[in-house]
Amino acid sequence: MSGEVRFDPEVGRQLLKYARLVSARGYVHNTLGNIVLRAPHPGYAHGVAYTKHAELSLEEMELENVVITDIPSSRILYGNKMTSIGHNLSREILRLRPDIHATLHVHDDAMIAYFGSGAFSEVRTLSLDMPFVLGKPIHYVPGHVDVESDVSGVKDFIQDTNSVVLLGHGITTLGRNISEAYHRLNSLTSEIRRNVAAELLALAKGSTALYRSQAEIESMYRFAESIIYPKRADHVMHED
């Protein structure tokens, strides 16, 4: 099979659309945030990866800043500029998760401040939506572990999560498509802000924030597919 890779303008436009959406939400501060989209290719078993090259931000990028890489290796298949170090993590996720076709990585202010305060070790669940949207528990990577330069540890956790929090660093969300990865990012960062607001209000009023129980959360994960992609209008959270 031919290994020739041609640029698909539709995939490029989709990447650019979500770069604009992510930037509009204030997630982008520098060159290190990124989006990766997998596209099928007959010459590459894992497909190929569309992404932004290094040296500029998602906010600044245009179609000419899209490069295409191999997935098992960092080889550039289209374009002539290098990707940033974070692309290593996204490539490894795509290699290990054939069900995933998009990743989104940002350095979110609220997340970095929330964990940087030293007061919290996890994002707790207040709302009904986060577990449904994420579909699986959040995985937390300790601040001293660099899974971008050394991806060997990714295989140990990536099957059991759709959202990776790199403590002191950023968030990477996974999706069957870029829309799903984007919704997961927004749900996770919203829940962090809700945690902060609930804790501050509870402190001011002398009350306790009302977080969901583990049993409730596990039930939401179990029915996530039925809620987000319903096949019927009623009795959605009933076992078939």
Feature names for model-found ranges:
Residues 1-240:
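Glycine-rich flexible loops
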